[in-house]
Amino acid sequence: MHNDKDLSTWQTFRRLWPTIAPFKAGLIVAGVALILNAASDTFMLSLLKPLLDDGFGKTDRSVLMWMPLVVIGLMILRGITSYISSYCISWVSGKVVMTMRRRLFGHMMGMPVSFFDKQSTGTLLSRITYDSEQVASSSSGALITVVREGASIIGLFIMMFYYSWQLSIILIVLAPIVSIAIRVVSKRFRNISKNMQNTMGQVTTSAEQMLKGHKEVLIFGGQEVETKRFDKVSNRMRLQGMKMVSASSISDPIIQLIASLALAFVLYAASFPSVMDSLTAGTITVVFSSMIALMRPLKSLTNVNAQFQRGMAACQTLFTILDSEQEKDEGKRVIERATGDVEFRNVTFTYPGRDVPALRNINLKIPAGKTVALVGRSGSGKSTIASLITRFYDIDEGEILMDGHDLREYTLASLRNQVALVSQNVHLFNDTVANNIAYARTEQYSREQIEEAARMAYAMDFINKMDNGLDTVIGENGVLLSGGQRQRIAIARALLRDSPILILDEATSALDTESERAIQAALDELQKNRTSLVIAHRLSTIEKADEIVVVEDGVIVERGTHNDLLEHRGVYAQLHKMQFGQ
């Protein structure tokens, strides 16, 4: 078991390495800086031997005169190398994290809808944000610890000397000065942390919008828009992180410089005869100092494996997602605009992970330009039929045709470009009204075309009342709009899309009667000259359909016009009686 685990860890790191490799120049610079940093510590302690034996033992005042300058120089070198190593490692880490996040984001946008059916939004957001950040600990924190502390231990074990009680007084002198420095730096930390939290919220929001609006992204071809949006906020987060690292890295050298100045003062004061008489042997001081100095690197090395394993565990989680199969897009047929004929032939479909088919032996033909309505109780399979037209799921048996060709023959982008979707749960993006209407195609449509679509959707009345009209930002998922207003924005989006096939999935079921009347005219306008598949609970909205299909437990049980089905006195007539009491 232990060997298997080690092999798994090594394989994970080997797979992570290609992500780190492009930034290896930063690793090389950091490695050199870390070795110089550890060497400066070791050389600092090595100076205690000539200092105590020659400077104090033989009362050679010249040693005590130049030694403080050497000490200050070494501490400055240590501070500079510490800053360079921390900054370079964090630069590499930030690049690795951003690269992993972008890979995850892009991969998730290509995942099938069934993947999101089985995953919670919070879990996926955690993968993009927190788990990606954890990867940094395996590529940065562990490297810093092993190189710096390892070099320090090797040097310190060579030079063991004792510590003097006089030097311990330095801690008392340094305490108030260091506390002031920490207070100043902490204020800077707080300001940067607030900016980082705000930026992380933007990253999370961008990812959440893509995840919650995954169907809209797919159907409207918004992958590039969402990728650019996410790249922008992700890079902004990286820059904020570098500001935090810069402030953090400079704090240690400042405190160390303060300590070196205090130590230099003690060394200079030691040249006075009254002080020299009270000093012990140099070897005792050096050994004791080395022993104390060894405590920190030993403790760090003890914890480095746990740190490394956390990073590797995060890598394995992310690679599990990256290894998940994306949507199959094997079709070759590309079509500019379909006629709109849609036909289901003996279609059977089962949701992934379930045993009972959601649809069984479905045969349905929707002629171009006609309207077919699907009715039935909740869970009967109506929305499933709509989802199959856009290939959000692939069927088990049978075939679905568009203009006489199997849907699987078309490229996904070409197929979904033929379909406009208006559902009960409208997803709007935290953007302007205009950009929501022209989603993923803002450069393709003119301002006049956007306004015309909004007018035809009876949306300009409330849009004109907004502070900035079409340029008003509507908040996350259109939080500033009512249900009816959000639906009209969605209808305007579908009108502007001008696709030959229209799916209305419970488009008015969540609205009150007044709101439904307000958008019914817009829906009628939208359905003109389009192949329409309407899913509705309210039977009053589909009475004019060319054909009404009744679905029960995944099977078509009735079909016909409104009047024909009422005369048949079957399931549709019962549903109609339940709603209208007739």
From Swiss-Prot:
Residues 342-578 form the ABC transporter domain. This is ATP-dependent lipid A-core flippase. CDD domains: ABC_6TM_MsbA_like, ABCC_MsbA. It comes from Escherichia coli O6:H1 (strain CFT073 / ATCC 700928 / UPEC). InterPro entries: AAA+_ATPase, ABC1_TM_dom, ABC1_TM_sf, ABC_transporter-like_ATP-bd, ABC_transporter-like_CS, ABC_transpr_lipidA, P-loop_NTPase, Type_1_exporter. The chain crosses the membrane at residues 16-36, 64-84, 153-173, 253-273, 275-295. Keywords: ATP-binding, Cell inner membrane, Cell membrane, Lipid transport, Membrane, Nucleotide-binding, Translocase, Transmembrane, Transmembrane helix, Transport. Homodimer. Involved in lipopolysaccharide (LPS) biosynthesis. Translocates lipid A-core from the inner to the outer leaflet of the inner membrane. Transmembrane domains (TMD) form a pore in the inner membrane and the ATP-binding domain (NBD) is responsible for energy generation. Belongs to the ABC transporter superfamily. Lipid exporter (TC 3.A.1.106) family. PANTHER family: ATP-BINDING CASSETTE SUB-FAMILY B MEMBER 10, MITOCHONDRIAL (PTHR43394:SF1), ATP-DEPENDENT PERMEASE MDL1, MITOCHONDRIAL (PTHR43394). In MsbA the ATP-binding domain (NBD) and the transmembrane domain (TMD) are fused. It is an enzyme of class 7 (translocase). NCBIfam families: MsbA_lipidA, PRK11176.1. The keyword Nucleotidyltransferase does not apply. Its main location: membrane. SUPFAM superfamilies: ABC transporter transmembrane region (SSF90123), P-loop containing nucleoside triphosphate hydrolases (SSF52540). It catalyses: ATP + H2O + lipid A-core oligosaccharideSide 1 = ADP + phosphate + lipid A-core oligosaccharideSide 2. Its EC number is 7.5.2.6. It is a multi-pass membrane protein. It is found in: Cell inner membrane. One of its GO terms (molecular function) is ATP hydrolysis activity. One of its GO terms (cellular component) is plasma membrane. The keyword Heme does not apply. It holds the Pfam family ABC_membrane. Residues 28-310 form the ABC transmembrane type-1 domain.
